[in-house]
C-alpha cells in the first residue's frame, strides 16, 4: 500500500503549449461553452500531445500489474491512449472535473474526433452530471456513429467504454460540524488573529 509520487520536469515550451496553451486557452474555455475565448493554435495541440506522451513515458515504468490508474481532468485526456501504446494493460479510469461541451461547440475544435477517440482507451469515464454525460453520448452517436446502451456502455472507434455520473463535492454536514466544534472555533480565532490588518483575497 502507499502512494508513489513522481515528478515530471517540463520545458518552458511544454508549459506554454500544453498547460497555458491547449489545456487552458483551448480546452478550458471550450468545455465551459466560451468559444469566444478559445484559442486555436497548432503548436498548442502539438504541445498537448507531446506532453501527455511524456507523462505516459514517466508513469509506465512505475505501474505494477495490479495497479488501477485514475487520471483526472482535461489536461490528460490522451494519456490512456499513450499508456496503451506503451503496453499498459491495467484498468484505467478518467474523471472530468469540467462540463462536457455541446457537440456543436466541440466540432469547432480542430482534431476533435482524435481527442474523443483517445478517450475510448479508458475503461471508465466519469462525469459530474447526467447532462454532461448526455452531451458526450450525443457527440459519439452523431460524430462517430457510436452506440450507447441504457447502462452507458458506449461503443465507437472499434472500442467500448463504460461511462457514468459521479458527482463529487465536500461533506457539507461534516464541514459544518467541524466549523461549529471547539477546535473549529479555536482555528477560526487563530486565523482571524493572523490576518489582522491584512487584505485577504
PLM regions and their residue ranges:
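Catalytic cores of carbohydrate-active enzymes across secretory and cytosolic contexts
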Residues: 1-201
Amino acid at each position: 500500500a502507499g502512494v508513489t509520487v513522481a515528478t515530471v520536469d517540463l520545458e518552458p515550451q511544454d508549459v506554454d503549449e500544453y498547460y497555458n496553451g491547449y489545456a487552458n486557452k483551448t480546452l478550458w474555455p471550450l468545455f465551459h461553452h466560451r468559444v469566444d475565448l478559445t484559442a486555436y493554435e497548432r503548436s498548442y495541440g502539438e504541445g498537448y500531445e507531446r506532453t501527455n506522451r511524456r507523462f505516459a513515458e514517466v508513469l509506465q515504468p512505475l505501474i505494477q500489474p495490479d495497479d488501477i490508474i485514475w487520471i483526472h481532468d482535461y489536461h490528460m485526456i490522451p494519456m490512456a491512449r499513450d499508456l496503451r501504446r506503451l503496453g499498459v494493460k491495467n484498468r484505467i479510469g478518467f474523471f472530468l472535473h469540467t462540463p462536457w461541451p455541446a457537440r456543436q461547440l466541440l466540432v469547432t475544435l480542430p482534431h476533435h474526433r482524435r481527442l474523443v477517440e483517445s478517450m475510448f482507451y479508458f475503461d471508465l469515464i466519469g462525469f459530474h452530471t447526467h447532462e454532461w454525460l448526455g452531451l458526450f453520448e450525443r457527440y459519439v452517436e452523431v460524430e462517430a456513429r457510436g452506440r450507447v446502451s441504457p447502462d452507458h456502455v458506449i461503443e465507437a472507434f472499434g472500442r467500448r467504454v463504460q461511462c457514468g455520473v459521479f458527482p463529487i463535492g465536500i461533506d457539507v454536514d461534516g464541514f459544518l460540524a467541524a466549523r461549529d466544534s471547539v477546535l473549529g472555533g479555536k482555528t477560526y480565532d487563530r486565523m482571524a488573529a493572523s490576518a489582522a490588518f491584512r487584505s485577504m483575497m
